[in-house]
UniProtKB/Swiss-Prot annotation:
GO cellular component: a single term: cytoplasm
Alphabetized UniProt keyword annotations: Cytoplasm, Methyltransferase, rRNA processing, S-adenosyl-L-methionine, Transferase
Subunit-level organization: Monomer.
Organism of origin: Escherichia coli O127:H6 (strain E2348/69 / EPEC)
Subcellular location: Cytoplasm
Protein name per Swiss-Prot or TrEMBL: Ribosomal RNA large subunit methyltransferase M
Amino acid sequence: MNKVVLLCRPGFEKECAAEITDKAGQREIFGFARVKENAGYVIYECYQPDDGDKLIRELPFSSLIFARQWFVVGELLQHLPPEDRITPIVGMLQGVVEKGGELRVEVADTNESKELLKFCRKFTVPLRAALRDAGVLANYETPKRPVVHVFFIAPGCCYTGYSYSSNNSPFYMGIPRLKFPADAPSRSTLKLEEAFHVFIPADEWDERLANGMWAVDLGACPGGWTYQLVKRNMWVYSVDNGPMAQSLMDTGQVTWLREDGFKFRPTRSNISWMVCDMVEKPAKVAALMAQWLVNGWCRETIFNLKLPMKKRYEEVSHNLAYIQAQLDEHGINAQIQARQLYHDREEVTVHVRRIWAAVGGRRDER
């Protein structure tokens, strides 16, 4: 199995292809990407027969920006007979996966696939039973075994394969299903909530998103991101010349500072979180974020970088490299992750966590 399917946001196939070609090449896993505009997925075809499995095992999924999900697959199954679609699929998977832990029958996230998605949900139940009988799936769901993927690109036409549960997205189609809170000031609140799900392990939420923490929201108006921090019982400095939602001010947890987010300097020394969703050139935002991290003004940050019309992967890579270089120059160890989230549009969301300072005299951040 030498092909890897990567699901992405429709319209960003070229960026997804450029990224996987670059990062696979860095690991000497060579191949080429098949791209169809607005398809919502990319296929990276490796030159060596076993390199698909090697790629999804060795390249950390968390290092990918534009992929929502990935899995290795074999040849395309076409013209599945309507009276028995199950037998050919089981045949393709036998000998490839043994005792898989979960089945996901998926499609790309496009308008054209919505009808197909209804079929996938109905088809999952009988297919799961058949795969269990054949030994492809274990008799119970377990996160410790590979995930079996059946990916329909058209009626009667699918790829079959698998991903490793330790190196994939835990979400169906790579999309967390979040509900918009009725009392939130704007839909942008879902970006930050999704970022928490993607970047912070669930078992670390109580420690890293704790009650009573201090946080700063730069460019906060009307308060979509502040809302997420308030919901987790943090104290928030919301920085923006524009007004904040009164419902947030009424909580007593928000201090509204009518200032430019680029000029604001914190006076507290115990700020755990800084978040930022400002419409500005990505290089300018990256420079501001680096300044906050280098100066130790916050421990963790989540921010958005708005994307240009062209060379989006190159632009994001350049900005992330700049932040990394600034941290390295000042002896600061940090984890950097970036992802184009489901709720993002022409942007990517970045998470940086200071871990410790390698320079004497700096406070350990762990």
